[in-house]
């Protein structure tokens, strides 16, 4: 009824918003990225997912490529992977192997990125490793944080953590 009266606008299934009177276009519209972040990544109080894949590799500066499909790992997904449309944006959602929280989200993002970095990077291996090392130093990850998610680390990730020297940057 509120949609019919014009108080609310329907964005997508189960997603409604209060439109603001805009300038040239009349009404305001929701940014698909904001809807994606709220639905699959975090709200005001908690974090329950993270962006991974080419999007995160781009955020780190390892590539200039922009993905057509945003990959997200989230606690709110029950399947091992599916693709959905949020507005005009395609999103690939995957279930998290480790429950994502405010405490471990950046570390889980890094661990996913380590495996994907060589596939997507436009930099040399040395520049890629240096970028990853500076990210670890900037975030000041601890060995305790790493041990809390260690059961989800696969062999390829563990190998690169050691070979690239990233594991030695974790603080005691």
Predicted regions and their residues:
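A short, charged helix-loop
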Residues: 85-95
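Alpha-helix initiation and capping sites
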Residues: 30-31, 46-51, 104
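Hydrophobic alpha-helical interaction segments
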Residues: 94-172
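Alpha-helix boundary/capping detector
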Residues: 24-28, 82-83, 136, 140
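Short beta-edge/loop segments at beta->alpha junctions of small alpha/beta modules
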Residues: 1-40
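Short gly/ser-rich loop at a beta-strand->alpha-helix junction or flexible surface loop bordering the NTP-binding
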Residues: 11-15, 42-80, 85
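Residues in well-ordered beta-strands of folded domains
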Residues: 17, 73, 92-94
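Short alpha-helix boundary/capping elements
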Residues: 7, 64, 137-140
